[in-house]
């Protein structure tokens, strides 16, 4: 036994010795590809620039412009509402479908494939497809998708739900199949009804899947860009009176599209767009951490 342990230690010793050599390339790539651009982005958020080389320090001016921008406030409100609606709708429907498909129904595998397929289509393609579908329906009523902010908002909700429900469904199916059979049998023997079994046995055991799906839908909702750009482009637009005077506000614009528009439309606001991106990162990080903490605290140990 001692001889075996000695041989193992002799094998592990050179591996530990050369571990930094194997880690170094990935670590350097991480620094060059993520850490350095991230730190540079934070610095540029305090500058006025057209290119990083001509950046001029302006302090907190960019952040003051962000908080006085009516378009950013509108995009934040839209994104918050969109995230709430999407999280509830996608997770409720995905869990319901997953629960139905784990009840030994015929053709379950076919249904899983069909529900998952929309997730394989790119967001821009989906945006243009659904734009044609919605406009084709609405023209019968003498209107179109971007004529009203309500149409655009709910059109985006439908598009994203249709795309993501299948993916979340797969995660919920994995969670439901991991529920211990002995717990279900014990609940049945104790005379628990279907709803009691669902809410007191199944859902507590599926909390890890709920945590994952809630995290994904939350972050996806806040990062939503390509579908928003392709479906409505943020339209329609209105002129509003803000803190900094009159400004054009895109009614269906979400945060990611607002940052993109700020950078590309107004060349003098590159630093402002960068400041928005930093605020956006902090916001998503805080919400994601808070959501993970809130849902993980409700998970049960297997």
Predicted regions mapped to residue ranges:
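A structural signal for multi-pass alpha-helical bundles of membrane permease subunits
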Residues: 14-302
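Short, Lys/Arg-rich, polar N-terminal cytosolic tail immediately upstream
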Residues: 1-13
């Amino acid at each position: 036994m001692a001889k075996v342990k000695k041989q193992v230690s002799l094998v592990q010793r050179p591996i530990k010795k050369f571990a930094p050599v194997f880690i170094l390339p990935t670590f350097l790539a991480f620094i060059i590809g993520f850490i350095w651009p991230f730190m540079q982005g934070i610095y540029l958020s305090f500058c006025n620039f057209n290119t990083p080389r001509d950046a001029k320090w302006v302090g907190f001016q960019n952040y003051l412009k962000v908080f006085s921008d009516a378009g950013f406030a509108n995009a934040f409100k839209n994104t918050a509402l969109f995230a709430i609606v999407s999280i509830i709708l996608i997770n409720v429907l995905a869990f319901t479908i997953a629960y139905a498909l784990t009840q030994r129904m015929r053709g379950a595998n076919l249904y899983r494939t069909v529900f998952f397929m929309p997730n394989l289509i790119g967001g821009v393609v989906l945006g243009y497809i659904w734009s044609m579908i919605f406009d084709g329906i609405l023209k019968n009523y003498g209107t179109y998708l971007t004529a009203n902010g309500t149409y655009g908002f709910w059109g985006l909700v439908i598009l994203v739900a249709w795309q993501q429900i299948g993916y979340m469904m797969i995660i919920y199916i994995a969670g439901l199949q991991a529920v211990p059979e002995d717990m279900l049998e014990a609940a049945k023997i104790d005379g628990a009804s279907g709803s009691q079994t669902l809410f007191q046995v199944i859902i507590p055991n599926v909390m890890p899947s709920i945590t994952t799906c809630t995290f994904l839908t939350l972050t996806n909702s806040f990062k939503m860009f390509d579908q928003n750009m392709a479906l409505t482009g943020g339209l329609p637009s209105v002129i509003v009176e803000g803190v900094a005077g009159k400004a054009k506000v895109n009614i269906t614009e979400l945060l990611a599209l607002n940052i993109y528009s700020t950078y590309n439309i107004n060349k003098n606001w590159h630093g402002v767009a960068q400041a928005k991106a930093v605020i956006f990162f902090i916001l998503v990080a805080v919400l994601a951490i808070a959501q993970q903490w809130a849902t993980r605290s409700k998970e049960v140990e297997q």
